[in-house]
Amino acid sequence: MSSPPALASPARIRTGRDLSITERNWVRAAAIGAAIVAVFAAVYYLEMGAGRWRENLRTAANPTEGAARYVGISHFLLAFLFLATSRRMRAVAPWGSFAVKLAGGALLCVAYALLLPLNPQLAGLLFAVYFLVHDCRDQVHFYFANGDAPEGRDSPRLRRALTWPPFLALVGLTGLAAAAMLLAGRHRHVPVLRELAPPLPAEIIVATLLVVAAAAARWLFLVRQEEPRGVAAFVRTHKPVFLVWCGTLFVVLMDLALTGEVRLIVLLHVTCWYVFVHEQMRRKPPERIPRTGSWAWMRTTAGGFAVLHAGLALALVAAGVIWAYRFQGSPELTEFRVLLDRKSFPFWTILHVTVSLGR
C-alpha cells in the first residue's frame, strides 16, 4: 500500500504559482471583507425597500461605508483593549508615550476638522494617505512575521525601504488630484474637474511635486543600499509585499471610482489584521487552553479571538439599529453620535493610526 502524499507546506498553496503566506492572508482578508460588504448590501437594500430612504433611518449610509465603520470601530476599540491589558503597559513610561501620541492624534483631528469645510477633497486625500501609509507599514510587519522575507535581511533600513513605495504612489496620486483641482478652477467646462472644486493654488501643487521628488530620491538611496542590482531586483526579491500593495491600491481606486470615498481600505486593513493574528494563534496555541469565555481565552486562542471580534462588531451593529430604528439617528444622543456617526469615523481612524505610531 503506497503512503499518502505529503501535505503541502502551510506557507504555500498552489494556485497557478506558489503564494506566500503574506499573499494568501491578503486574499483571505479581501474575501472576508467582500463577504461583510455583501451582508451590509443585503441589509441596505432591505432597508431601502422598506422605505427608509433617509440616511438617519438606516443602519448605514451605504454598504461599504457601513461595513468599514462598524468593523473599523470594533477594531479600534479592541486594539486599545489589547494594548491596555498587555504586559508592557504595566509600567508608567508606556502610558506616558500613549498619552503623548493620543494628544498628537487629537491635534491632527482638529486640523482635519478645520480643513474639511475649506477643502473637503484635500482633507479626504490627506486622510487616505495617512491611513494607507499606516496600512502599508503593517503589511511590512506581516511580511517579516510570516517568514516570507529573505532570511537574515530584517533591518530598520530595509523596513524603511519597503515602506517608501506606497508612500510615493500615494503622494503621487495626491499630486495628480491636486493638479486636477487646480485645473478645475481654470477649466470649469470639464465635468470631472468641475466636481473637484474648490481648486488648489499653484503653490500647493509645486510643494506636492517637491515632496514626491524628495521622497523618490530618498527611496532610491535606500534601495541602492539594500540591493546594488537596482530597483527591479529589489522588487523581485520582495515580491509578496509589492503584490499586496498593488492589490490594496486597486481596492482604493475602485472604492474612489464607485463611491467617491476611501473607506474599503479601512475594512481591508481590519480583516488583514484579523487573519494575521488568527493564523498566528492557530499555529502557536497556548500550552494550557484557558477557560472558554474568559478574557485569556479570547486574547490567546484563535477561537476566542474570532468570538471576541464577531461579538463586538455585532454589538455595535445592534447599537446602530437601535439608534436608527428607535431614535431615528438623533444627534442629541451624544453616546451614539460620537461612537457610531459616520462623520465621527474619520476622527476615530486618525486617533487609531496616531496611537499606533512606533508600535
Predicted regions and their residues:
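N-terminal signal-anchor module of multipass membrane proteins
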Residues: 2-74, 345-348, 353, 357-358
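Central hydrophobic cores of alpha-helical transmembrane segments in multi-pass inner-membrane proteins
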Residues: 12, 63-86, 133-141
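Alpha-helical transmembrane segments
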Residues: 26-41, 101-108, 167-172
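Membrane-helix interface motif
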Residues: 44-54, 175-193, 320-331
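Hydrophobic core segments of alpha-helical transmembrane domains in multi-pass membrane proteins
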Residues: 65-75, 121-133, 207-211, 259-274, ...
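Membrane-interface helix-loop-helix junctions at boundaries between adjacent transmembrane segments
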Residues: 96, 107-202
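Loop-centered beta-sheet repeat module
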Residues: 167-245
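C-terminal transmembrane-bundle signature of multipass membrane proteins
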Residues: 245-359
